[in-house]
């Protein structure tokens, strides 16, 4: 099974081979500021990810151990990349078709915005 996706303008595209891991929803202040709200993503082993349009992919070093990838044309936030790890997180909203996954965890909930509640019954950390 291959999952495909892209940024809003299509300048950056990607393919993931195989099944996707269940996504989590990050409520940290960095993800909220970059995405505009919570950020749902799935962790994918690097060797199963192919990115096209890398010349349009910009990286922002958001902390000493993590960089965030976004399209330099449309600004879509696509990737959360801890280079020392064997996986990279991909934005769930960037996939072209339904993924068949279900949210399995809310993370950094202590940092969540005060304008919403989490009431879906999914575990929180």
What are these regions (language model features)?
Residues 1-125:
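A short Gly-Trp-Pro
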């Amino acid at each position: 099974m291959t999952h495909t996706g892209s940024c809003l303008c299509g300048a950056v595209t990607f393919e993931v081979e195989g099944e996707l891991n269940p996504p989590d929803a990050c409520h940290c202040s960095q993800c909220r500021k970059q995405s505009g709200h919570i950020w749902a993503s799935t962790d994918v082993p690097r060797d199963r990810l192919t990115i096209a349009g890398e010349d349009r992919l910009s990286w922002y070093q958001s902390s000493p151990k993590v960089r965030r990838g976004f399209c330099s044309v449309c600004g879509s936030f696509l990737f959360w990349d801890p280079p020392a790890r064997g996986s990279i997180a991909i934005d769930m909203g960037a996939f072209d078709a339904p993924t068949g996954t279900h949210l399995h965890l809310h993370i950094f909930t202590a940092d969540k915005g005060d304008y919403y509640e989490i009431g879906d019954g999914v575990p929180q950390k």
